[in-house]
Structures are given as C-alpha cells and as structure tokens.
C-alpha cells in the first residue's frame, strides 16, 4: 500500500533530517533559525488584528481628563487643590526644619520622619502642579515623555514612602522590644542602610515598569481618564498585548509593596506581644502612644493602595480616583498634623522653630 506524502511534513522533516549532501548547517545555524521562528510567533501573539493596525501609534501626547471634564468645575477645583499643595509643602518643610534644628530630635525615628516629609513633598510635586496647570488650561495635554517621567517618579516616591514607613516600624519595634540595645541596633550605619534600600528598590521597580510601558503600542485614542499618568489608566489605552505588564504589576509590584507591609505587620505583632506583658496600664498607654501616629498613616496609605491596585485592570473605574486622591494628596498633607499633634517632642520642636523664625 502506497503512503501519502504531505509536502509540508516533508519540508519540516528535511529541515532537520536532510541528507549529507544538503546538510551543511551546523547546530548554531539551526538554533538561529528556530530562534527567528519563535520570535515571529511571539510578535504575532502580541499584535492586534489587521483591522486595528492602521489605528496603532505611539502618541506624542496624552490628554488628561482630570477629576471633572466640566469647564465650570475647573476653577473651584483649582481653588481647592492649590491650598492643599501649599499646606502639604509648608507643613512637611516645617517638620524637616524642626527636626534638623532641635538636638533632642536627632534620633533614628525623627531622622526617618524628616526623610518621609521630604519624599512627601516630592511626591505631591510630581502630580499636583501639573494638575493645577490643567485646571486653568483648555488643552489639558501632557507629552509622552513627560507622562512616562511623571509615572516613573510617582511610582518611585510612592514606594519609597512605604519602605520608609517600614523602616519606622522597625525602629519602633527595636525601641519597645529591645530598649537597652536600641542605640547599638539602630546605629547610624543601620539607618543609612535602611535609607539606601528605601530609595534603591523603588527606583528599580519604577524603571522596570517604565521600560515595559514604553514597549506598548497605543490605539488612536490618547485620552487618559485620570488626573495624572498612573499605571492602570495608561495601560487601558494600549492595543498591544500587555499581559506581561499586567502580570508584572500583580506579581513584582505585589512583592515590592508587600515586603515593607510585611515588615510593618511583623514589627507591630512583636510590639503588641511585648506591650501586653507590661504590668502597668500607664506603661501600656505610653508604649502605644509612640506608635499611634505611625499606625494612622500606615492605615491611610496601605488601605487606599490595596483597594486600588490589587484588582484586575478591567475592574479599574473612574471611581477609583477617590482612593488615589487619599494616598497621593490627602495622606502627604495630613502626615505633619498626624505626627505633630500627639507628639510632645515634635510640638516642642515646632514651637522652638517658630520662636526662632519670629525673632529673626
């Protein structure tokens, strides 16, 4: 019985099992050919349909719709967010100056608080000034490069905040659970190491996200339904496959955020166990009072972030802007008040600073 030969099968077999006369390819050439085939397949998986290719582009600019698209809302919103920005910058700047000018505040806890205040100033400066300009502008545009730059520093400073909060939790753990070894453990070298990690890890994280975002191909629409270039709203404009990007957000991003959060949880569990062993009620109150401000900031910061980012891209809606405002605008503004109102040393330091400024 004669076998039917499929020409396509023969071609594939001949590619790998050619006779000696035609088999001039070495192993490296075969690997190269297979690599080109795999690369072509991967590109085809990431490409949109032929119908949509004509609408693909890398836009020169985006349009930020902001908090409201109604013209009559723009000036009232400007009147609301300008004072918020000024209060945030001035409040955090006063915290920094008070800590630097008072020798009693030259401790690891206040060192990290001063750095947190500096990062909060940078954090809101990345977002609010551009938002204020757009409130008074008719175009509300942001260039492609400016958008990626804003996204980079937003992610970097936001994650730096979380790592600094973790460093402050570790400081409180050592102060309460190991008070006799506090100076030795929380040395200048340890504080600098925690500070370097708090800056380096978030910046590597941001760089990875920006590189992945820059590989995306966008559709004809360049309208971002948000008040700044956040990761999720920009992803929604992409026509190319952003599966890798979305998986990275949900895995690597989760790891970057959960690492400091885990440090905070473990530190406070150890603190709770230690405080419950204190016999006097006054001692328990004193121990908890040193952690109250930090816990309030952690709750505000991580509560809004977990609600916003740990959800699929398809579930992201305009309503999530409220959660974004909490951790991008309100939390940096409230930090100086939270850390100073219930902190006797901080209030005294601020009072001394204000007295010096009046005398000058």
Swiss-Prot record:
It is found in: Cell membrane. Disulfide bonds join 147-239. GO terms for cellular component: plasma membrane. Pfam families: 7tm_4. It is a multi-pass membrane protein. GO terms for molecular function: G protein-coupled receptor activity; olfactory receptor activity. The chain crosses the membrane at residues 76-99, 108-129, 151-170, 190-208, 247-269, 287-309, 322-341. Keywords: Cell membrane, Disulfide bond, G-protein coupled receptor, Glycoprotein, Membrane, Olfaction, Receptor, Sensory transduction, Transducer, Transmembrane, Transmembrane helix. Gene3D superfamilies: Rhodopsin 7-helix transmembrane proteins. Belongs to the G-protein coupled receptor 1 family. Odorant receptor. This is Olfactory receptor 1L1. It comes from Homo sapiens. The gene is OR1L1.
């Amino acid at each position: 019985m004669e076998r039917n030969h499929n020409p396509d099968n023969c071609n594939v077999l001949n590619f790998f099992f050619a006779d000696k006369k035609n088999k001039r390819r070495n192993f490296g050439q075969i690997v190269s050919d297979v690599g080109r085939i795999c690369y072509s397949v991967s590109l085809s998986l990431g490409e949109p349909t032929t119908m949509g290719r004509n609408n693909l582009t890398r836009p020169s600019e985006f349009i930020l719709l902001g908090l409201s698209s109604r013209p009559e809302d723009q000036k009232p919103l400007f009147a609301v967010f300008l004072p918020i920005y000024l209060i945030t910058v001035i409040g955090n700047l006063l915290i920094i100056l008070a800590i630097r000018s008072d020798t009693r505040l030259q401790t690891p806890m206040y060192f990290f608080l001063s750095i947190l205040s500096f990062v909060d100033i940078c954090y809101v400066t990345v977002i609010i000034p551009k938002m204020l300009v757009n409130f008074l502008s008719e175009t509300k545009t942001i260039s492609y490069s400016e958008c990626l730059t804003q996204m980079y520093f937003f992610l970097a400073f936001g994650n730096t905040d979380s790592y600094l909060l973790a460093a402050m939790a570790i400081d409180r753990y050592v102060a309460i659970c190991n008070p006799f070894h506090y100076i030795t453990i929380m040395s200048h070298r340890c504080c600098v190491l925690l500070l370097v990690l708090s800056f380096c890890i978030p910046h590597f994280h941001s760089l990875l996200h920006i590189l992945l975002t820059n590989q995306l191909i966008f559709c004809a629409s360049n309208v971002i339904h948000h008040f700044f270039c956040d990761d999720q709203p920009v992803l929604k404009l992409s026509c190319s496959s952003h599966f890798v990007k979305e998986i990275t957000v949900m895995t690597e991003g989760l790891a970057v955020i959960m690492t400091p959060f885990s440090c905070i949880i473990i530190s406070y569990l150890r603190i709770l166990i230690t405080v419950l062993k204190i016999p006097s009620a006054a001692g328990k109150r004193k121990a908890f009072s040193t952690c109250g401000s930090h816990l309030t900031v952690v709750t505000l910061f991580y509560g809004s972030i977990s609600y916003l980012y740990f959800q699929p891209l398809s579930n992201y809606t305009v309503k999530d802007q409220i959660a974004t405002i909490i951790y991008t605008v309100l939390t940096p503004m409230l930090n100086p008040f939270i850390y100073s109102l219930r902190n006797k040393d901080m209030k005294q330091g601020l009072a001394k600073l204000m007295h010096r400024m009046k005398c000058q």
